Amino acid sequence: MKNVVAASAVSTSFFDNNGELEEEDRLNEVHSKLIRYINEQPGIRYRELLRLSGLSNGVLSYHITNLEKSRQIIADRNNNNKITRYYSNNIPIEETDIIGHIRNNAERQIILFILEHDSCTCNEIIEYTKKAPSTVSWHLKRLKDGGMVSVLYNTGRCQQRLYKVRDFESITNVLSKYKESFASYTIVNNYTEIMEDL
């Protein structure tokens, strides 16, 4: 009878350990999948991770929090914590700032337009983007505050603000370096191909 009890205890212990291993494997699998998505699309937002992973909101939140606490990923919270973007822990902070702006559709359009034309007026940007003047002004302010563009004033008869990219080399390097992650953005791909041909 003692042998049966001992064998039962051993087998229960084995199943407990096996269950723990299975749970750890599942945890590692989910973490690996999330890290892969973040590596493939630096600057990805929570909703996109939710869609790609197929996880429920609570489960994704749990895993993202663990990855962030263990410093396997970086969470960049901007705009009073309204916008969070996720990055691999090996991406320099200067690049995360640029990527965050490029991932925003309106700001990406504005940045690429200014890159192509060296400097532009607000009206030229409005005409190109076909967005409301207030929308363009708001995004230009964000780009200026984020250190992406600077404002110059031409000294002609009619003084105008000109918007110019502040660090041409850094922005074009990021566009080129992360070209694959911007694959769905046709306009970025066209621009990087032009830059590579020069």
Regions found by a protein language model. Name each.
Residues N57-Y62, K131-K141:
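Canonical helix-turn-helix DNA-binding module
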Residues M1-L21, Y46, L55-T96:
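Long, low-complexity, charged/polar intrinsically disordered regions in eukaryotic proteins
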Residues M1-R36, N66, I91, Q109-E116, ...:
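Long, low-complexity, charge-rich intrinsically disordered regions
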Residues R36, R47, C122-N123, K141:
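Residues within the helices of the helix-turn-helix
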Residues Q41-R45, H117-T121:
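Short capping segments at the starts of secondary-structure elements
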Residues E48-L52, E124-T129:
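A short acidic, leucine-rich amphipathic alpha-helix
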Residues T84-L115:
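Donor-sugar nucleotide-binding helix/loop cap in glycosyltransferases
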Residues Q41, S70-R71, G146-G147:
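Alpha-helix C-caps/helix-loop-beta hinges
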